[in-house]
Amino acid sequence: MVKSSLQRILNSHCFAREKEGNKRNDAMPLLSIPSSSESSRASFNCCSNLGPGPRWCSDVPHPPLKIPGGRGNSQRDHNLSANLFYSDNRLNITEELTSNNRTRILNVQSSLTDGKQVSWRAVLNNNNLYIEIPSGTLPDGSKDSFAILLEYAEEQLQVDHVFICFHKNRDDRAMLLRTFRFLGFEIVIPGHPLVPKRPDACFMAYTFERDSSDED
């Protein structure tokens, strides 16, 4: 369960708007779309241990996936080939159609109680959800939106892990590392088969611990 982590997110300073934002680098994608032949089910026991895992982010060239992250307003990337994936009073999620039936590109828009809307893009692959923390100043409402998305990942998607990624050259990199470690995320060492080979990016993972009764 992530209830305690959700409360920590709401109390954290990681998502607070800063006076001086970082330079945006949205043109550089951090994740790639895998081919269906490379995806396979495998265990993931510890972020610091290079165990077996799906080579869905191998060196084989894939079309780049741009994940700009939350924008803090109602602007969204409209895709003519997007289908409704999920919708409730807090989330509206559309899926971009791809040739890979094991990988889903999700456009997430969360509606907050104060009327704000925050948008994210994510990749759902092999029961793992990948979210990029956007460069620059995070929009107002980001922490609440992230908490909603994390809760949805656990209760609705029932994923095994949630990965976040951000560029290593961020000015607030140290603060992000401290905050997400406090929330229960672990640093994923470079070269792990569950994350893309991107030396310019930092990946962290949250593993959901489920009771045996939840799996019945």
Curated annotation (Swiss-Prot):
Query: Which InterPro entries does the record associate with it?
Result: Acyl_CoA_acyltransferase (IPR016181), ODC_AZ (IPR002993), ODC_AZ_sf (IPR038581)
Q: Name one GO molecular function term.
A: ornithine decarboxylase inhibitor activity
Q: What the protein does?
A: Ornithine decarboxylase (ODC) antizyme protein that negatively regulates ODC activity and intracellular polyamine biosynthesis and uptake in response to increased intracellular polyamine levels. Binds to ODC monomers, inhibiting the assembly of the functional ODC homodimer, and targets the monomers for ubiquitin-independent proteolytic destruction by the 26S proteasome.
Keywords assigned: Polyamine biosynthesis
Q: What would be the name of the gene that encodes this protein?
A: oaz1
Name listed for the protein in its UniProt record? Ornithine decarboxylase antizyme 1
Q: How does it assemble?
A: Interacts with ODC1 and thereby sterically blocks ODC homodimerization.
The biological process GO terms on file are: polyamine biosynthetic process; positive regulation of intracellular protein transport; positive regulation of protein catabolic process; viral translational frameshifting
Q: Which Gene Ontology CC terms are recorded?
A: cytoplasm; nucleus
Q: Belongs to which family? A: Belongs to the ODC antizyme family.
- Say yes or no: keyword DNA damage present: no
Species this chain originates from: Xenopus laevis (African clawed frog)
